[in-house]
């Protein structure tokens, strides 16, 4: 899922917002990392762009979205899952969305802004410090007492984050296991746990631990153990695609490996 964020006007990313559209074109042309990983892992790729020419509002000045926009994006995420899907990985593209993910995580689980933000797409230390100030300003404006997932995402989220939450919720309804990517998709899914309903994500796994400082805190808060720690920070669901190959290996071993009795191997005495 892809969308743009108004908070980039605050200088929280070294890349301009038009990169989001350019990367969507790259996905569609088959030239991105996720295209190669999906082919290798035997995954079908679907790309959903959400109003790229209409960024969310800068959430330091007002809520990022109104509740109707959040619900619309969640429905788009739910609708993106094909009828034949039996395993879902989710990822995102959106310049500025690590700032949104950090703000959502802080609003949901508390702590200091400096503990949730990181370099994202390549900020230096001064940029990370500035980013923490932006997240803190947003929390000061909107508060951390959002009573449900929709209000939380309306205050701080992006359309692609809401779409991920909608897809994760739809997968829960359809009993489809979900492999989350990194920090951003984990933050999007965490919105569904408002009210301390961590069991809302019982069908979800976290594929890998992102180097973004907030991801370890978030995974711990969600009581999830990421499968891999490869220092990946690309996004695009790339970590989830790599972890899928581990899942395939586990299934192949489970289904094909003979028991000691079947293989005629003597057991311990």
Segments (PLM) and residue ranges:
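N-terminal loops that bind phosphate or other acidic moieties
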Residues: 1-269
